[in-house]
UniProtKB/Swiss-Prot annotation:
It comes from Saccharomyces cerevisiae (strain ATCC 204508 / S288c). It is found in: Membrane. Disulfide bonds: none annotated. Residues 1-42, 94-232, 276-383 are cytoplasmic. GO terms for biological process: protein transport to vacuole involved in ubiquitin-dependent protein catabolic process via the multivesicular body sorting pathway. This is Protein COS5. One of its GO terms (cellular component) is membrane. Residues 64-72, 254 are extracellular. Present with 815 molecules/cell in log phase SD medium. The gene is COS5.
Length: 383
């Protein structure tokens, strides 16, 4: 009995120690007022910033010795406005270079701490890497990653996507050299954790729709897709875009007829494109939303266009309840929902390189294939 009590006390001590240890995790987001102040601090501590400041010394001498102030003024303006761009580019390249030299350590941290797709799981990895990079003089501050999401994003862009897109072993060795076995082990750990998360989500965390009979699709409410679209873009958030659009119309009045038609037309098409991609911030940022979308597709019994209408109706309610969207009009209809799945999920399976501002969702590829297969099977069964 006493031995059992001692074991229980030890286990409690270990648990309490782990809880205290997790509470001690301090990231830059806990120290700085915002990501902007952290970013300014990182810029200030970079090598590029003092170089930019030193450029003003010869300019000051030139101003003093020159009889003609026009040329010094032009150069000063160039340094003033192009200098910050130079500093930002150099800092970005330095961060990328520093992290690329520490891929093995990055992989070891992932393997040891077994993070899943939940950003909170990456806090320990981010904190450990911040300390490691500073102590080993790979970075000049203790604040390489601002938060856990920054660390997770670095894992996605530096390891997960580039490595997964390499189809053969030779290409992997050529790009990642000695890091290949460490990356394979880290990705294996990560994929297993995501699989656990998927199974848990499928059995316990999956959202169940209630009162769907009251949910109408926007196609049943609005006269046309154009009126639905215009209603959504006429908001306070899109006011700067509309002001720019009106300015474009006013400026184009001074040019020929073709330009007056072409310029506002292209600007409006750009706004449509921005609107289509704006929805990705609601559905594609959180992993739980993406998993729910795929589960809804897989579990939908109705086939064809009616099936996609049901999926759209369920997701409209889900995103509204989760406060990811301001109303129940995320998808206009089933066709719009099918297009969204095809464009932002299924087509990524054939991607050959990383996409700008759009994750490839490599960890969800098996479930995306399952979702597509379930829709194809439903269509075949109907035929």
């Amino acid at each position: 009995m006493k031995e059992n009590e001692l074991k229980n006390e030890k286990s409690v001590d270990v648990l309490s120690f782990k809880q205290l240890e997790s509470q001690k995790i301090v990231l830059p987001q806990d120290l700085f007022r915002s990501s902007f102040t952290w970013f300014c601090y990182e810029i200030y501590k970079s090598l590029a910033f003092p170089i930019w400041m030193l450029l003003w010394l010869p300019l000051s001498v030139w101003w003093k010795l020159s009889n003609n102030c026009i040329y010094p003024l032009i150069v000063s303006l160039l340094v003033l406005f192009l200098g910050p761009i130079f500093v930002l580019v150099i800092c970005g390249l330095s961060r990328k270079r520093s992290l690329s030299k520490q891929l093995i350590q990055f992989c070891k941290e992932v393997t040891e701490n077994t993070p899943s797709s939940d950003p909170h799981d990456w806090e320990v990895v981010a904190a450990n890497l911040n300390s490691y990079l500073y102590e080993n003089k790979a970075w000049n501050t203790r604040y390489f990653f601002f938060n856990a999401m920054g660390c997770q994003e670095a894992f996605r862009t530096t390891l997960l996507e580039p490595f997964s897109l390499k189809k053969d072993e030779a290409a992997k060795v050529k790009s990642f050299k000695d890091s290949v076995p460490y990356i394979e082990e880290a990705l294996g750990v990560y994929f297993r954790e995501v699989e656990k998360q998927w199974k848990l989500f499928n059995t316990e965390k999956s959202w169940s729709p209630v009162g769907l009979e009251d949910v109408q699709l926007p196609k049943d409410i609005h006269r046309s897709k154009l009126t639905w679209f215009l209603k959504r873009i006429f908001t306070i958030y899109s006011l700067p875009l509309w002001l720019a659009f009106l300015n474009c119309i006013c400026v184009s009045q001074h040019f020929c007829l073709a330009f007056r038609i072409l310029c506002p037309g292209l600007f409006f098409l750009m706004m449509v494109w921005l609107f289509q991609n704006m929805r990705t911030t609601a559905l594609l940022v959180k992993m739980e939303h993406k998993m729910q979308f795929l589960l809804t597709i897989i579990n939908e019994q109705e086939s064809g266009a009616n099936g996609w209408d049901e999926i759209a109706r369920k997701m409209n309610r889900y995103l509204f309840e989760k406060k990811a969207w301001k109303n129940e009009e995320f998808f206009f209809e089933g066709i719009d929902c099918e297009w969204f799945f095809s464009h932002f999920f299924y087509r990524l399976l054939s991607a050959k390189k990383s996409m700008w501002l759009l994750p490839l969702n490599v960890e969800l590829w098996p479930y995306i294939k399952e979702a597509q297969l379930s829709r194809n099977e439903e269509s075949l069964m109907k035929k």
